[in-house]
């Protein structure tokens, strides 16, 4: 990956129209809705782009809540019977030109680090995502590799507890 690429908030100079990925819905979202939803504070769109505005990948983060009854039993245990505050990893995509270079793992790691940092300011007990119907099995495998668990109520939705993210980040800090 070119060193000129970095994580940025979506801006006007980013060339959304050039983005092509395996999921049509993820591609269309970036072109047609991302700027509007970012501007009206519905989500935050983070792009991995170079200085020329070329987007190699992107993800969105926003606030969410999950009903306790929708969570796996091991997560429900010991929790108050209130909705669980969470961070929604709403959209996630890698441009076809940048596939098979480890960018998906890099972007997911950046999304988790950003979600964890935000959870220190505004409580969030978990990260939740929905796998797009037209997403590849590779996407699902990537999420499972990072520890995401399918929700019993909807197997297209997956959850990762923030405590797991914290443990993984602490482990990485100890290794450095």
Predicted regions and their residues:
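Non-catalytic substrate-recognition and accessory regions of acyl/acetyltransferase enzymes
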Residues: 1-101, 105-140, 144-176
């Amino acid at each position: 990956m070119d060193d000129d690429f970095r994580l940025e908030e979506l801006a006007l100079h980013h060339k959304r129209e050039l983005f092509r990925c395996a999921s049509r819905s993820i591609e269309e979202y970036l072109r047609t809705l991302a700027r509007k939803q970012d501007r009206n504070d519905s989500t935050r769109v983070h792009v991995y782009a170079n200085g020329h505005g070329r987007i190699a990948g992107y993800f969105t983060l926003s606030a969410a809540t999950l009903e306790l009854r929708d969570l796996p039993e091991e997560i429900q245990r010991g929790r108050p019977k209130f909705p669980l505050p969470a961070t929604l990893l709403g959209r996630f995509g890698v441009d076809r030109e940048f596939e098979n270079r480890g960018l998906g793992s890099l972007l997911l790691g950046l999304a988790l680090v950003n979600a964890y940092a935000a959870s220190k300011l505004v409580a969030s007990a978990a990260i939740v995502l929905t796998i797009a119907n037209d997403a590849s099995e590779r996407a699902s495998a990537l999420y499972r590799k990072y520890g995401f668990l399918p929700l019993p109520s909807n197997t297209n939705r997956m959850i990762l507890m923030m405590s797991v993210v914290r443990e993984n980040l602490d482990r990485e800090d100890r290794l450095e």
